[in-house]
């Protein structure tokens, strides 16, 4: 769900690549003191924090991801009986002049407090995709690269996907143990070099960044 929930702040703020990531996640036990470890599947719940370098003249931006039933604190501007997001989740963007809340897929963007929405008429500036993104994708393939205007071209979707994978990278590193089996050196703030696509302060995490493909299946990147 990361692509659907992180897309609104990623697109509107123009985040780019994160420079650091850290996380915490739940543990499950099959008996006393023996935690289950299933590194190839997601945890029951997790919390991830990323930092994005600020644009010229603007501060850095922190992005917080929560799942598995973990929710952020309710904004003070939101009434006690007003819904936060929607049934599947949502996003809250906090700026210097206020907050905006939306549901999953960016549905129903709302200024907070919600009273600020009264009488508000925001003009539509982004092109809509009435045929749906499946048809848009097929039409773009038929037309050829660069011929059609897309709502999520590779130039945008690539950095967005890399951002979400940074969260997975932190989660995979979280339970790496040292030689004693008692310490977890990956439970730190991981520093990301986006140009060279590597973690600079915990080399063991880089095993999850790239892989060696079988002969004949190598990617051209």
Model-derived regions, located:
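Glycine-rich, aromatic-lined ligand/substrate-binding cores of catalytic
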Residues: 1-153, 159-221
């Amino acid at each position: 769900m990361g692509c659907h929930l992180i897309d609104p702040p990623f697109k509107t703020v123009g985040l780019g690549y994160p420079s650091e990531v850290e996380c915490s996640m739940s543990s499950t036990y099959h008996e006393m003191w023996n935690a289950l470890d299933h590194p190839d599947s997601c945890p029951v719940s997790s919390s991830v924090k990323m930092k994005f370098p600020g644009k010229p003249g603007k501060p850095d931006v922190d992005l917080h991801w929560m799942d598995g039933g973990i929710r952020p604190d309710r904004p003070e501007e939101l009434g006690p009986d007003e819904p936060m997001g929607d049934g599947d989740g949502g996003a809250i963007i906090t700026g210097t002049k206020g907050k905006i809340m939306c549901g999953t897929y960016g549905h129903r963007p709302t200024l907070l407090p919600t009273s600020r929405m009264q009488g508000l008429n925001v003009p539509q500036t982004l092109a809509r995709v009435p045929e749906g993104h499946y048809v848009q994708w097929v039409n773009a393939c038929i037309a050829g690269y660069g011929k059609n205007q897309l709502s999520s071209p590779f130039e945008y979707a690539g950095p967005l996907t890399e951002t979400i994978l940074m969260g997975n990278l932190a989660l995979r590193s979280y339970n790496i143990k040292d030689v004693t089996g008692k310490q977890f050196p990956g439970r730190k703030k991981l520093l990301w070099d986006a140009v060279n696509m590597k973690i600079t302060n915990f080399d063991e995490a880089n095993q999850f960044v790239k892989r060696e493909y079988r002969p004949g299946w190598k990617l051209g990147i």
